[in-house]
């Protein structure tokens, strides 16, 4: 199974004396393949293209997501690559104010709050089949000091996530 998806955002902003075209396009695909009756391989890739400049003067392509993993019995999954940080599990349930605010979720590649590189993620649904509705996630990100800018560096990172999605049959 392979899904192709995309988005085009035509945007222009006028703030504090600035006048900027912020148009972009996103293109991605996600896929999965059945390896055997219990094991499924999956992956996703998504890129963003700057469409706000004249041809030949764009700032380039940004890789937003690029990861691959294995899912065992739809209860346990493990993946590695550029993916959402484990702290984004909170942001996925709330309004992170993507245009005006939500600054704590905007620092990509640090703090495991947004898209980030080099993360190994283990997730289980129904706590390995023991408790219906209880999910657990654990994530590790290796140190990255390859950029000379210290605001783009980070040490080893760990994060954990716990969720329960059926409080009193509410679906929450």
Where on the chain are the PLM-derived regions?
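Outer-membrane beta-barrel pore domains
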Residues: 167-172
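Outer membrane beta-barrel
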Residues: 1-142, 154, 163-166
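Conserved adenosyl
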Residues: 157
